Amino acid sequence: MRLPPNFKCADVICDFCGYLAQVKTVNTPQIESAPKTILGAAWRPQKERMDAAIYLFLVLVNPHKTSHSIFYLSADLQQPEMFRPRTPLSSTARRAGWQGFCYELDRVLGGLVRIR
């Protein structure tokens, strides 16, 4: 079941067991392997939850949306080093000071499992 928009650090929840997961999509012409880096969301909430068992699903979609892959990375294989904070937005930005992060998936490529 999808969680409400802007729910921090999770996108879906199993209505049976309560399992939380985060879903990221990436448009790419290459669906056979995961990208080395993908954009995350807000850094502070993610940093606060890095010790929580939130699992990452990565869905890759090609530009024509004719095929896709699903990659899974369990929480126990996620490492603090794979979360790279981005530079905070400048003081002139609409959301000045907001800071995002990137997933550095090349640090955990061996842990990603392609399930589709």
State each model region's role.
Residues 1-20, 24-116:
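Nucleic-acid endonuclease domains
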